Amino acid sequence: MSLDLALDVQYATASDYLPSEEQFSLWVKTAIGNSMEQAELTIRIVDARESQMLNSTYRGKDKPTNVLSFPFEAPPEIELPLLGDLVICAAVVENEAREQDKILEAHWAHMVVHGCLHLLGYDHIEDEEAEEMESLETQLIESLGFTDPYKEQ
């Protein structure tokens, strides 16, 4: 079974390197895997100002962040393939990759996989949940040909 994906990528900022829609599509399909037959998802690439505003509004943290996940929650009687939205801050992803000595493309892939897992209901608030989510992220990222994102460089 292959995922029927309707992906809308919105580039709301410019940068030296932004992944292509094809890369985003591959990363989303890898993260979602066989958990859904159809999925609709928006990925919005933003600057630090927009990320900070959204992070402040929805999480109470007045600073930009790497990825925000906004799951779509339909009433139980309505079945829709709408998974939700990811908002990714290009500047934060670039800074983190540089500071953590990670390959920029690998860090982008990790942020997309991480965000998609949140949209699928995974979380990392409790230690046990965090271990499960990180283990799955590592498997998915390694399946894309990148190294373990949680391994110390």
Swiss-Prot record:
Residues annotated as transmembrane: none
GO molecular function, one term: RNA endonuclease activity
Keyword Iron: no
Keyword Nuclease recorded: yes
GO cellular component terms, semicolon-separated: cytoplasm
InterPro entries xref list: MetalPrtase_cat_dom_sf_prd, YbeY, YbeY_CS
Protein keywords: Cytoplasm, Endonuclease, Hydrolase, Metal-binding, Nuclease, Ribosome biogenesis, rRNA processing, Zinc
Protein name: Endoribonuclease YbeY
Record: residues binding Zn(2+): 114, 118, 124
Signal peptide boundaries: none
Named cofactor requirement(s): Zn(2+)
Compartment list: Cytoplasm
NCBIfam families: rRNA maturation RNase YbeY
Short name of any one Pfam family annotated for the protein: YbeY
EC number: 3.1.-.-
